[in-house]
Amino acid sequence: MAFNPFALGRPDLLLPFMGAGVGGPGAGGPPPNLFFSMLQAGFPPGPVGSPPEDDGVTDDPKVELDERELWQQFSQCGTEMVITKSGRRIFPAYRVKISGLDKKSQYFVMMDLVPADEHRYKFNNSRWMIAGKADPEMPKTLYIHPDSPSTGEHWMSKGANFHKLKLTNNISDKHGYTILNSMHKYQPRLHVVRCADRHNLMYSTFRTFVFRETEFIAVTAYQNEKVTELKIENNPFAKGFRDAGAGKREKKRQLHRMNGDATQSPPGKTASLPTHSPHPSESNSEDDEPTLKKCKPEPSQTPTTSSLSTSTTPTLSAHHPLRSPQFCIPPPIDMMYQNMPMDLLAHWQMATLFPQFSMALNSPAAAASLLSKHLAKASSECKVEATSEDSEEAEKPEVKKEQKSVTPPKKGGFDVLDLLSKP
């Protein structure tokens, strides 16, 4: 294990020697500037003075990359990793097996991504070319494995999986993702630090491991079709892209068949889509994979003859907007409200048929004047009826007197009065 130069009296004297890679299997490549990564991540430097005391622990960490053959296949084509504002995980997954640790000692396992060179790239004529000088880099986040710190026995039995490491191009990121520049080449580095406390990381012994086949170029969309094909073939979440030709047609038939079963299935049962069983520690929506395109359903041909359906479940049809009912004239209001004044009923009916006349009923003054007119009209009608009755009673005696003075006509020139008048 190597000592932290910040723990020495003259750390600048060790800077020329930091260009040499750390020995051991899988090591080498860029200098292990773990200290500067810690400073950028916000770790305070350790105390300057004498080197830390030897704790007497003897270990020789060794790291082996899982799926190394797959990484080599990608490296031959030029590995690309998609970066997004919301963060994207890397594929192939960066998983390692660790050995040579002290079983009882505590260890931190960390990773950072550093620029592989000082160039900017472009994809032209099916190959990557240097397009100019690299853009300034944002401060990199030192990703600490969630299981840290753990005993050496834990790391040697479980290994380390960095599937939760996310890449982004959002310079305003607040989630702790690793910020990268598009069209730039980066190299992942793995650090094994023997330390039990996070605050002592800056002056603890460590070892850095670099695997050249994990080098990649950050992109916002895949440039090389070969890389896309490799991701589709090996990513467990991209199985939907593996069908081609007749396979696509068969997939559409299965999709329509499932849709038909969903419409004809009883209410208690629902049609479920086939599910895949990916790696338990990986997520479907966040892995570095092509976006699954939604296949459009084929237009169904309308049959010339109608057929009766035996299914009791109503089929889903297109949504039709609600329409207002046709205009109809309501019945006369005096038929329903016989005891109300006719003028009020007339105004009410006019207000219901024509809203512009509703102001007469909504205004209190108009309603009061309408009521006063109604009362005045009712009182005048009562007075007219009373005067008519008095005039009829006054005319009746005169009619009787006239009837007394009228003599009935004689029958045959002889009347009973004539007999009584004679002696």
Swiss-Prot record:
Tell me if Translocase is a UniProt keyword of this record: no
Could you list this entry's UniProt keywords, alphabetically sorted. Developmental protein, DNA-binding, Nucleus, Repressor, Transcription, Transcription regulation, Ubl conjugation
DNA-binding region ranges: 70-243
What CDD domains does the entry give?
T-box_TBX2_3-like
Choose one Gene Ontology CC annotation of this protein and give it.
nucleus
Q: Where in the cell is it found?
A: Nucleus
Q: How is it modified after translation?
A: Sumoylated.
InterPro entries attached to this UniProt entry:
p53-like_TF_DNA-bd_sf, T-box_DNA-bd, T-box_sf, TF_Brachyury, TF_T-box, TF_T-box_CS
* Extent of Basic and acidic residues compositional bias: 394-404
Q: What does this protein do?
A: Involved in the transcriptional regulation of genes required for the development of pharyngeal muscles derived from the ABa lineage. Acts as a transcriptional repressor and binds to T-box binding sites in its own promoter to negatively autoregulate its own expression in neurons, seam cells and the gut in order to restrict its expression to certain tissues. May function together with the nfya-1-NF-Y complex to repress its own expression.
This chain belongs to which protein, by name?
A: T-box protein 2
